[in-house]
UniProtKB/Swiss-Prot annotation:
It is found in: Cytoplasm. Keywords: ATP-binding, Cytoplasm, DNA damage, DNA recombination, DNA-binding, Nucleotide-binding. Its main location: cytoplasm. This is Putative DNA repair protein recA homolog 4. Belongs to the RecA family. GO terms for cellular component: cytoplasm. It comes from Arabidopsis thaliana (Mouse-ear cress). One of its GO terms (molecular function) is ATP hydrolysis activity. The lineage of its organism: Eukaryota, Viridiplantae, Streptophyta, Embryophyta, Tracheophyta. The keyword DNA-binding applies. Disulfide bonds: none annotated.
Length: 226
């Protein structure tokens, strides 16, 4: 079989982020269904707010409420450890009954061995191995269920290397076809209220499966204020 016949460009169905400017900047109209997306950035940069705003678009289209999250249709879970959380995510994906899953956050996915150990014990790369195993399993299930899986992640400083790195090892960078770097760039005052202005940088927008593009033309880095 020729490669040109086996792999054909196609538009991937998406979920809107709730921001028209960001949807346009992403190049595909939103966050792709059946894929894994990472939203990361420093604290108080708007990562969780973006995820909640997108959920509000799915739960109530009219956006009658200020934030719009319909708590009657929103499942909230607070697992005891990282393995339990990722096992729950796997169950939800395979059920095919959930459109969007948000994991907030990667840094909070503490391995059980670390919870059971003593303070000061060395637990090198346990979380990275846990994430790597889970993402290998998720990648195929997401395509079958067309569920969107969003991981919210923090950045931290690392000595002797890049100024900022994300938690959870390198597996998330490899498996996520779209990574959104969120940064706060200022505040806007309207009357007595302050609103956060955020800049979003889309780092890569190619599907992991075969490294194919999410749309026909190649995706450039996109910036958008949300």
């Amino acid at each position: 079989m020729y490669l040109s016949r086996a792999v054909s460009p196609r538009n991937v169905p998406v979920f809107s982020t709730g921001s028209f400017a960001l949807d346009v900047a992403l190049g595909v109209g939103g966050l792709p269904k059946g894929r894994l997306v990472e939203i990361y950035g420093p604290e108080a940069s708007g990562k969780t707010a973006l995820a909640l705003h997108m959920l509000s678009m799915l739960l109530i289209r009219s956006l009658a409420k200020a934030i719009g999250v319909n708590t009657e249709n929103l499942l909230l879970s607070q697992p005891d450890c990282g393995k339990q959380a990722l096992s729950l995510v796997d169950t939800l994906i395979q059920s095919g009954s959930v459109d969007v899953i948000v994991v907030d956050s990667v840094a909070a996915l503490v391995p059980k061995g670390e919870l059971d150990g003593e303070m000061g014990d060395a637990h090198m790369a346990i979380q990275a191995r846990l994430m790597s195993q889970a993402l290998r399993k998720f990648s195929h299930s997401l395509l079958l269920s067309q569920t969107l899986l969003i991981f919210i992640n923090q950045v931290r400083e690392r000595f002797g290397g890049p100024t900022e790195v994300t938690s959870g090892g390198n597996a998330l960078k490899f498996y996520a076809p779209m990574r959104l770097d969120i940064k706060r760039i200022g505040l806007i005052k309207k009357g007595e209220e302050f609103f956060r202005m955020t800049k979003c940088l889309c780092l890569n927008a190619c599907a992991h499966n075969g490294k194919s593009s999410l749309r026909e033309d190649s995706e450039e880095q996109a910036r958008s204020a949300i």
